[in-house]
Amino acid sequence: MKSAVETLNPTRVRLSIEVPFEELKDSLDAAYKKINQQVTVKGFRKGKIPARVIDQRFGRGAVLEEAVNDALPKFYTEAVNEGELNVLGQPEVDITELKDGELLAFTAEVDVRPEIEIPDYSGIEVTVDALEVTDEEVEKAVEQLRERFAATNPVERAAADGDVVTIDLQAKVDGEVLEDGVADGVSYTIGSGELLDGIDEAVTGLEAGGEATFTSQLKGGSAEGKDAEVTVKVTAVAARELPELDDDFAQMASEFDTLEELKADSRKRLETTKQYDQATQAQERVLEELLKLAEVPIPEKLLADEVQTRKHNLEHHQLGQMGLDLEKYLEIQGKTLEEFENETSEQAIKGIKTQFILDELVNKEKLNVNQEELTEHLMRRAASSGMSPDQFAQAVVEGGQVPMLVGEVARGKALAVVVEAAKVVDTNGEVVDLEDDEEAAEAAAETTEAPAEAAAEDKAEDKKAEEKNEA
């Protein structure tokens, strides 16, 4: 076999491959054997038909076609390895010459990873939010905890903001009561905004037994998006009573003996959360600067596939779980289809660039992934997918996507290398030490997925859906 590589552009090549006919012998033998098992000829046992009879009865062309189809992948792979090419996706193959007994010649055009020169990233400087926890934030956190321990007591008065009312609901569209538009005994906190628009105004001021009618656009169900005439009847009113903020509350709501200890713990938790957010912010901003420094050509077909994958994931997984279609989603977001497609394309370009650069950095820095790192990463991904580690691991293995997980961890480590070399300061001008924030680095790297990663997510989500249906 002879092969030659022609570079069409930085991301696409054409392979020209010539195969002497004697190198097709194994494929020709396999073709005769396959046809032998598929056909019957009177006078011959199945599988024992001579080659000359097959040629006479079914044509030499059918045999050659079968042999070529068998041989192409093998010779294409040999040519790719010989040319030391890092190919992306499937090739477009064109058979240019096929002379029986003499020669098979074909070309294969395929996308390849572009050669990328890693820029000097040591001079990157970024600014992040300062790690500050205010007294107001601590008070808010404690107040939220206090809300969780609120008690409700029945009252004989008109309902007011913050009260918990028990209500019966009936929705009509065009004068007809909807089959799924009746609900009794619903508990609702006035002012929470958790039900229909207009319900707060309707129930405020009503006592138990009181009734009101209002018009509201339905947020779900069989008549989603339509205006409905909603009748609400209050059957009970209860006032929420918050516990006193004192040491007794601290002992009831936590493992601490005093309110001051509870507040100190709340402050510490807020600091930890902000520390993680600060690290993630640093990685995102360092990554943005790195992308600005590097020239990364994007293969057109890879970009088109990635855009399609992102659209598919949004429509069939994320929106499907929320009961929305793309049209409704865009309406809620206030975006046109053109704006959505432009944004999706920009996100895809960023994702591909990020993967190319970080993968190149992994090779340059010779970064490896050990079993412990891979296991920890798998458990985090499983949790984010709402699956058990065993379920997620099975889906990944069945989809042949273990290398995808390894790549994610490696890219996270590569990004951490860039962040470590960068100068990160907060809005107060203080240098930020991001040492040991590897988990946040991985999280930032995972926000940019190439098609392989997105495909694995599809498989994991499909697996989860199948198990749910079987249950």
From Swiss-Prot:
Any Gene Ontology biological process: cell division
GO cellular component labels: cytoplasm
Bias kind Low complexity: ranges: 442-454
Pfam families found in the cross-reference section: FKBP_C (PF00254), Trigger_C (PF05698), Trigger_N (PF05697)
InterPro entries, alphabetized: PPIase_dom_sf, PPIase_FKBP_dom, Trig_fac, Trigger_fac_C, Trigger_fac_C_sf, Trigger_fac_ribosome-bd_bac, Trigger_fac_ribosome-bd_sf, Trigger_fact/SurA_dom_sf
Subcellular location: Cytoplasm
Domain of life: Bacteria
The reaction(s) this protein catalyses: [protein]-peptidylproline (omega=180) = [protein]-peptidylproline (omega=0)
Keyword Manganese: no
Top-level class of the enzyme under EC nomenclature: isomerase
Compositional bias of kind Acidic residues: 432-441
E.C. code: 5.2.1.8
Spans annotated as Disordered: 431-471
Domain PPIase FKBP-type positions: 162-243
Annotated Basic and acidic residues bias: 456-471
Notes concerning its domains: Consists of 3 domains; the N-terminus binds the ribosome, the middle domain has PPIase activity, while the C-terminus has intrinsic chaperone activity on its own.
Family according to the record: Belongs to the FKBP-type PPIase family. Tig subfamily.
Xref: HAMAP family: Trigger_factor_Tig (MF_00303)
Name the UniProt record assigns to this protein: Trigger factor
